[in-house]
């Protein structure tokens, strides 16, 4: 899994862990200034915000990318074990999600 602290262009954030049940938890990464989530890390997936056109493009391009359950339309859910996206692409998507969320 990616280390968010090593991604350039990410400002102050808060990490909250929510226990979903006895076996699963979810890490929410929120922007410190507005307390809005920009990244959700589940056991096997990550979810982030994106713009609609880029989201549709990535959903059509990769089998491991689908619409986010957390963010809904305008968000992506990526199966982390599939390794279809390069680490640099994933970092760019996380940075984009941070910047989109910062402006909400």
For every predicted segment, state its role.
Residues 1-104:
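Charge-dense, helix-prone N-terminal extensions
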